[in-house]
Amino acid sequence: MEQNEFGLIEKIVYLNRVAKVVKGGRRFSFSALVVVGDGKGSVGFGLGKAQEVPEALRKATERAKKSMIEVPLIDGTLPYEILGRFGAGHVLLKPASKGTGIIAGGAVRAVMEAVGVTDVLTKAIGTNNPHNVLRATVAGLASLRSAEEVGQLRGKKLEAPRK
């Protein structure tokens, strides 16, 4: 977990060396998948490709900063259960009680830590490809709505929950 000068958390999810076969042999380049978040409900991801690793990381970070979304959080967890989908990847995101921690692997864990979630249960279904899992996670988080937003859409006033 790395913080930059703007207080953003940057996480490298996946770094890949790819080869293009040309007449003289193989040409190598790199692709980097990076997640950026502020730890307070904002998160974004980016994919960068270049001939050198640092340049690929820089491009990925720039794209991640441009694709930031807001996520409504309640006491360090999600407001309700959601299923994010992208391609063959499905990611189930469930709110968890205090002290549970982040029960997630790989790409999902990076997103949850960057967005500022402290307690969550997750399950990646259908694929283990980091690109698709990451996009499914972000799609799920992007579709979350706060109680105020839902009330506004329905034209209802928000009341205190019944016990």
Curated annotation (Swiss-Prot):
Ranges for domain S5 DRBM: 8-71
Keywords: Ribonucleoprotein, Ribosomal protein, RNA-binding, rRNA-binding
Gene Ontology CC terms: small ribosomal subunit
GO process terms (BP): translation
InterPro entries, per the entry: Ribosomal_Su5_D2-typ_SF, Ribosomal_uS5, Ribosomal_uS5_bac-type, Ribosomal_uS5_C, Ribosomal_uS5_N, Ribosomal_uS5_N_CS, Ribsml_uS5_D2-typ_fold_subgr
Organism superkingdom: Bacteria
GO molecular function: rRNA binding; structural constituent of ribosome
Domain notes for this protein: The N-terminal domain interacts with the head of the 30S subunit; the C-terminal domain interacts with the body and contacts protein S4. The interaction surface between S4 and S5 is involved in control of translational fidelity.
Subunit description: Part of the 30S ribosomal subunit. Contacts proteins S4 and S8.
HAMAP family reported in the protein's UniProt record: Ribosomal_uS5_B (MF_01307_B)
Family label: Belongs to the universal ribosomal protein uS5 family.
Function: With S4 and S12 plays an important role in translational accuracy.
UniProt-recorded name of the protein: Small ribosomal subunit protein uS5
Gene: rpsE
